[in-house]
Amino acid sequence: MSTEPIAVSITGLRKSFGDKTVLDGVDLTIRRGEFVVLLGPSGTGKTTLLRLLTGLEVPDAGEVLVPGRRTTVYQEPRLIPSKRVLANVLVGLRRTRSNRAAGLAALAEVQLDGKADQWPATLSGGEAQRAALARALVREPELLLLDEPFAALDALTRLRMQDLVGDLVARHRPAVLMVTHDVDEAVRLADRVIVLDRGRFAVDTAITAPRPRERADPDILRYQTEFLAHLGVGGSDRRPIRSAS
């Protein structure tokens, strides 16, 4: 069991919209440096859970404890067109030499050296998403929330971004909760994968396969098959693999 401090603690979380219960008694703990991926069909409450962690939604019941420094990277980079790349990375921060240096260092970490003075419109989709990552990193988050951050990218760029995010998380050690529909992506990146179904966690599984993870590895295929079954794809034999502990 990890001895890292707990970054996220959720107990008995309930959230409804009108007559529809979206989250029904959810319990979740994420430790610092732990990469947790949330899978589930559309409309099962994945994004609602992220919004509760950011404070954009308020729970109807239960307790949500999160660190003060937290930030979100979305599917769309959300760069401000009228600000240059470095200014986008530093948006909302004080204009100091130290912050400028931190912004340039963050751009270097995401391999955007030399792009600081460019306009967002000149960036490719992958570069724009890397700028969004730099904007998150410069805030030194204790909790990093990723809302389908690679969904709009082509397959090759997506793989490169997965590798980059994995490296950055290993280096900076925030707690991470990522929402995705991509089972391959989940198994490739996660320390734990959770499947959300009808407002509850149907699966909470530790991924113990060594890194780097290859799709052809039998253990990886086993995890993928299990998660796909819980998502209603493939076979219907839903035997548990291994519970997170």
From Swiss-Prot:
ABC transporter domain boundaries: 8-223
Q: Which InterPro entries match?
A: AAA+_ATPase (IPR003593), ABC_transporter-like_ATP-bd (IPR003439), ABC_transporter-like_CS (IPR017871), ABC_transporter_ATP-bind (IPR050166), P-loop_NTPase (IPR027417)
Catalysed reaction, written as an equation: ATP + H2O + aliphatic sulfonate-[sulfonate-binding protein]Side 1 = ADP + phosphate + aliphatic sulfonateSide 2 + [sulfonate-binding protein]Side 1
Q: What class of enzyme is it?
A: translocase
One Gene Ontology MF term: ATP hydrolysis activity
Q: Where is the signal peptide?
A: none
Task: List residues binding ATP.
Answer: G40, P41, S42, G43, T44, G45, K46, T47
Q: What is its EC number?
A: 7.6.2.14
Where does this protein chiefly localize?
membrane
Compartment(s) where it occurs, according to its Swiss-Prot or TrEMBL record: Cell membrane
Q: Which UniProt keywords apply?
A: ATP-binding, Cell membrane, Membrane, Nucleotide-binding, Translocase, Transport
- Membrane topology qualifier: Peripheral membrane protein
Give the highest taxon in the source lineage.
Bacteria
State a GO cellular component annotated for this protein: plasma membrane
Tell me the protein family, please: Belongs to the ABC transporter superfamily. Aliphatic sulfonates importer (TC 3.A.1.17.2) family.
**Function in brief:** Part of the ABC transporter complex SsuABC involved in aliphatic sulfonates import. Responsible for energy coupling to the transport system.
Question: Quaternary arrangement and interactors, per the entry?
Answer: The complex is composed of two ATP-binding proteins (SsuB), two transmembrane proteins (SsuC) and a solute-binding protein (SsuA).
Q: What name appears for this protein in its UniProt entry?
A: Aliphatic sulfonates import ATP-binding protein SsuB 1
